[in-house]
């Protein structure tokens, strides 16, 4: 999936969703929810994608097991970021979600990450494991994991 028109054609029975590298960077795409895709088991977002997004909602998905976000996705550069907006990532009520991986600089300006009621979560990996690399995830946020 890479074009805005692809979003309209996602089958409700989809189990694996892949957004490629450098995709869905249209200025009109400010909010995205995967909640209508009730059978989704895995979400993969490539590098440098969803660059204008302000809200990403991954909620109430009873089959979701894994979320992977590449580098510099859901990232606005200094010139395009809206400093008056709230940037929100919601991972909530996904009862079998086991793993979340987020690449370097992704969600840098997202100031409201919410990870809630993820009872099967075993692994959260953010940024680089190399201590010399600035990860920059949720740079201005207070991060909390509840439930």
Regions found by a protein language model. Give the residues of each.
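Low-complexity, intrinsically disordered short peptide segments enriched in small/polar/basic residues
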Residues: 7, 16, 93, 97-102, ...
């Amino acid at each position: 999936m890479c074009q805005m028109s692809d979003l309209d054609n996602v089958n409700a029975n989809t189990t694996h969703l892949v957004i490629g590298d450098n995709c869905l960077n249209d200025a009109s795409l400010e909010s995205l929810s995967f909640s209508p895709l009730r059978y989704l088991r895995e979400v993969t977002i490539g590098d440098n994608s969803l660059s204008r997004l302000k809200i990403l909602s991954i909620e109430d998905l009873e089959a979701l097991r894994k979320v992977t976000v590449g580098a510099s996705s859901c990232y606005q550069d200094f010139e395009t970021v809206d400093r008056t907006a709230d940037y929100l990532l919601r991972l909530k009520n996904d009862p079998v979600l086991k793993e979340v991986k987020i690449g370097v600089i992704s969600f840098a300006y997202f100031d409201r990450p919410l990870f809630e009621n993820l009872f099967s979560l075993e692994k959260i990996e953010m940024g680089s494991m190399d201590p010399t690399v600035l990860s920059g995830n949720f740079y201005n946020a207070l991060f909390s994991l509840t439930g």
